[in-house]
From Swiss-Prot:
An accessory protein needed during the final step in the assembly of 30S ribosomal subunit, possibly for assembly of the head region. Essential for efficient processing of 16S rRNA. May be needed both before and after RbfA during the maturation of 16S rRNA. It has affinity for free ribosomal 30S subunits but not for 70S ribosomes. Belongs to the RimM family. The PRC barrel domain binds ribosomal protein uS19. Its main location: cytoplasm. The keyword Transmembrane helix does not apply. Keywords: Chaperone, Cytoplasm, Ribosome biogenesis, rRNA processing. Residues 105-184 form the PRC barrel domain. GO terms for molecular function: ribosome binding. It comes from the Bacteria. GO terms for cellular component: cytoplasm; ribosome. This is Ribosome maturation factor RimM. Binds ribosomal protein uS19. GO terms for biological process: ribosomal small subunit biogenesis; rRNA processing.
Length: 185
Protein backbone atom coordinates (compact mmCIF):
# COMPACT_ATOMS: atom_id res chain seq x y z
CA UNK A 1 0.00 0.00 0.00
CA UNK A 2 1.37 3.40 -0.92
CA UNK A 3 0.26 6.25 1.33
CA UNK A 4 1.66 9.72 0.66
CA UNK A 5 4.24 10.42 3.34
CA UNK A 6 5.55 13.81 4.37
CA UNK A 7 8.50 13.82 6.75
CA UNK A 8 6.40 15.12 9.56
CA UNK A 9 5.22 13.88 12.89
CA UNK A 10 2.45 15.67 14.77
CA UNK A 11 3.91 17.32 17.87
CA UNK A 12 0.62 17.62 19.76
CA UNK A 13 -1.72 15.17 17.98
CA UNK A 14 -5.47 15.46 18.48
CA UNK A 15 -7.92 12.81 17.28
CA UNK A 16 -10.68 14.37 15.17
CA UNK A 17 -12.18 11.23 13.68
CA UNK A 18 -11.82 7.56 12.90
CA UNK A 19 -11.72 5.43 9.77
CA UNK A 20 -14.61 3.01 10.24
CA UNK A 21 -14.01 0.69 7.32
CA UNK A 22 -13.91 0.21 3.58
CA UNK A 23 -16.72 1.40 1.33
CA UNK A 24 -17.01 -0.27 -2.04
CA UNK A 25 -14.17 -1.69 -4.10
CA UNK A 26 -12.41 1.47 -5.31
CA UNK A 27 -10.54 2.46 -2.14
CA UNK A 28 -13.17 4.64 -0.45
CA UNK A 29 -13.49 4.51 3.35
CA UNK A 30 -16.24 5.42 5.81
CA UNK A 31 -15.17 7.92 8.45
CA UNK A 32 -16.64 9.01 11.76
CA UNK A 33 -16.14 12.69 12.59
CA UNK A 34 -15.56 13.67 16.22
CA UNK A 35 -15.81 17.41 15.50
CA UNK A 36 -18.75 19.34 16.94
CA UNK A 37 -20.22 19.84 13.46
CA UNK A 38 -19.40 16.70 11.51
CA UNK A 39 -18.46 18.64 8.38
CA UNK A 40 -15.80 20.58 10.31
CA UNK A 41 -13.49 17.59 10.04
CA UNK A 42 -12.63 18.89 6.55
CA UNK A 43 -11.48 22.26 7.94
CA UNK A 44 -8.35 20.65 9.38
CA UNK A 45 -5.47 19.69 7.14
CA UNK A 46 -3.26 17.67 6.95
CA UNK A 47 -4.62 14.49 8.49
CA UNK A 48 -2.24 12.03 10.08
CA UNK A 49 -2.65 8.35 10.89
CA UNK A 50 -0.40 6.14 12.96
CA UNK A 51 0.03 3.29 10.50
CA UNK A 52 2.47 0.38 10.82
CA UNK A 53 4.34 2.04 13.70
CA UNK A 54 4.87 5.35 11.86
CA UNK A 55 3.04 8.64 11.53
CA UNK A 56 1.87 9.16 7.97
CA UNK A 57 0.15 12.09 6.34
CA UNK A 58 -2.85 11.09 4.27
CA UNK A 59 -4.33 13.41 1.67
CA UNK A 60 -7.95 13.62 0.66
CA UNK A 61 -8.82 13.18 -2.97
CA UNK A 62 -12.64 13.23 -2.71
CA UNK A 63 -15.29 13.15 -0.01
CA UNK A 64 -19.07 13.10 0.19
CA UNK A 65 -21.84 12.88 2.75
CA UNK A 66 -23.77 9.64 3.08
CA UNK A 67 -27.22 9.46 4.75
CA UNK A 68 -26.82 12.90 6.43
CA UNK A 69 -24.51 11.71 9.20
CA UNK A 70 -21.48 9.84 7.87
CA UNK A 71 -18.89 10.71 5.27
CA UNK A 72 -17.07 8.55 2.82
CA UNK A 73 -13.67 9.70 1.63
CA UNK A 74 -11.16 8.73 -1.00
CA UNK A 75 -7.49 9.19 -0.18
CA UNK A 76 -4.78 9.68 -2.79
CA UNK A 77 -2.98 6.41 -3.61
CA UNK A 78 -5.58 4.21 -1.92
CA UNK A 79 -7.04 2.51 -4.95
CA UNK A 80 -8.79 -0.68 -3.88
CA UNK A 81 -10.77 -2.29 -1.09
CA UNK A 82 -7.73 -4.10 0.36
CA UNK A 83 -5.85 -0.82 0.79
CA UNK A 84 -8.94 0.77 2.34
CA UNK A 85 -9.44 -2.17 4.73
CA UNK A 86 -5.83 -1.82 5.93
CA UNK A 87 -6.69 1.71 7.13
CA UNK A 88 -9.80 0.59 9.04
CA UNK A 89 -10.06 1.49 12.73
CA UNK A 90 -7.23 4.03 12.56
CA UNK A 91 -7.71 7.41 14.21
CA UNK A 92 -7.61 10.56 12.09
CA UNK A 93 -5.29 13.03 13.79
CA UNK A 94 -4.37 16.69 13.29
CA UNK A 95 -2.03 19.14 15.01
CA UNK A 96 -3.78 20.86 17.92
CA UNK A 97 -2.33 24.22 16.85
CA UNK A 98 -4.95 24.22 14.08
CA UNK A 99 -7.77 24.56 16.59
CA UNK A 100 -9.14 28.09 16.98
CA UNK A 101 -8.34 29.98 20.17
CA UNK A 102 -11.17 29.97 22.71
CA UNK A 103 -12.05 33.41 24.02
CA UNK A 104 -14.92 32.50 26.36
CA UNK A 105 -13.59 31.57 29.81
CA UNK A 106 -16.23 28.82 30.11
CA UNK A 107 -15.20 27.02 26.90
CA UNK A 108 -12.73 24.15 26.86
CA UNK A 109 -11.40 21.67 24.39
CA UNK A 110 -11.82 18.04 25.42
CA UNK A 111 -8.09 17.55 24.89
CA UNK A 112 -7.46 20.02 27.72
CA UNK A 113 -9.91 18.37 30.15
CA UNK A 114 -8.83 14.76 29.53
CA UNK A 115 -6.08 13.92 32.01
CA UNK A 116 -7.17 16.51 34.58
CA UNK A 117 -7.43 15.48 38.22
CA UNK A 118 -10.99 15.69 39.62
CA UNK A 119 -11.24 17.15 43.12
CA UNK A 120 -14.41 17.62 45.16
CA UNK A 121 -15.18 20.94 46.83
CA UNK A 122 -14.18 19.14 50.07
CA UNK A 123 -10.68 18.42 48.72
CA UNK A 124 -11.13 14.69 47.98
CA UNK A 125 -9.51 13.37 44.80
CA UNK A 126 -11.98 11.32 42.74
CA UNK A 127 -9.51 10.35 40.00
CA UNK A 128 -8.58 11.58 36.53
CA UNK A 129 -10.66 12.26 33.44
CA UNK A 130 -9.95 9.43 30.98
CA UNK A 131 -12.54 10.34 28.35
CA UNK A 132 -15.61 12.42 27.68
CA UNK A 133 -19.00 11.24 26.42
CA UNK A 134 -20.92 13.60 24.15
CA UNK A 135 -24.67 13.66 24.79
CA UNK A 136 -27.31 16.02 23.47
CA UNK A 137 -27.91 17.49 26.92
CA UNK A 138 -24.30 17.97 28.07
CA UNK A 139 -20.91 16.31 28.09
CA UNK A 140 -20.15 13.58 30.64
CA UNK A 141 -16.70 13.21 32.20
CA UNK A 142 -15.50 9.62 32.61
CA UNK A 143 -13.37 9.70 35.75
CA UNK A 144 -11.17 6.75 36.69
CA UNK A 145 -10.22 6.14 40.32
CA UNK A 146 -7.81 3.48 41.58
CA UNK A 147 -8.82 3.98 45.18
CA UNK A 148 -11.09 0.97 45.59
CA UNK A 149 -9.55 -2.28 46.79
CA UNK A 150 -11.74 -5.05 45.38
CA UNK A 151 -11.22 -3.98 41.78
CA UNK A 152 -8.28 -2.47 39.99
CA UNK A 153 -10.17 0.74 39.21
CA UNK A 154 -13.63 2.25 39.24
CA UNK A 155 -15.03 4.61 36.63
CA UNK A 156 -17.41 7.38 37.64
CA UNK A 157 -19.55 9.50 35.31
CA UNK A 158 -19.86 13.20 36.15
CA UNK A 159 -21.99 15.61 34.09
CA UNK A 160 -20.02 18.60 32.81
CA UNK A 161 -22.48 21.28 33.93
CA UNK A 162 -20.64 24.51 34.64
CA UNK A 163 -21.40 26.33 37.89
CA UNK A 164 -23.88 23.69 39.09
CA UNK A 165 -21.51 20.67 39.21
CA UNK A 166 -18.25 21.92 37.71
CA UNK A 167 -17.14 24.64 40.11
CA UNK A 168 -13.69 25.42 38.71
CA UNK A 169 -11.44 24.37 35.84
CA UNK A 170 -7.74 25.15 36.31
CA UNK A 171 -5.90 24.09 33.17
CA UNK A 172 -2.58 25.35 34.55
CA UNK A 173 -2.75 22.93 37.50
CA UNK A 174 -4.75 20.30 35.53
CA UNK A 175 -7.50 20.26 38.16
CA UNK A 176 -11.29 20.31 37.84
CA UNK A 177 -13.22 21.03 41.05
CA UNK A 178 -16.67 19.45 41.28
CA UNK A 179 -19.61 19.50 43.65
CA UNK A 180 -20.05 15.72 43.49
CA UNK A 181 -19.87 12.86 45.94
CA UNK A 182 -19.10 9.20 45.32
CA UNK A 183 -21.01 6.70 47.40
CA UNK A 184 -19.73 3.17 48.04
CA UNK A 185 -22.35 0.45 47.93
Amino acid sequence: MKVIVINSTPINPIVIGRIKGAYGILGWVKILSFTEKIEDIFVYNPWFIFFRSKWKVIKLEYWRLMNNKNYIVKFFNVSDRNHAMALSQHNLVVESIQFPKLYNKDEYYWKDIIGCKIMTINGKCLGRVISIIDTKAHDILVVRSEEYGFTKYVDCLIPFILKKIIKDVDLIKNIVVVDWEIYKF
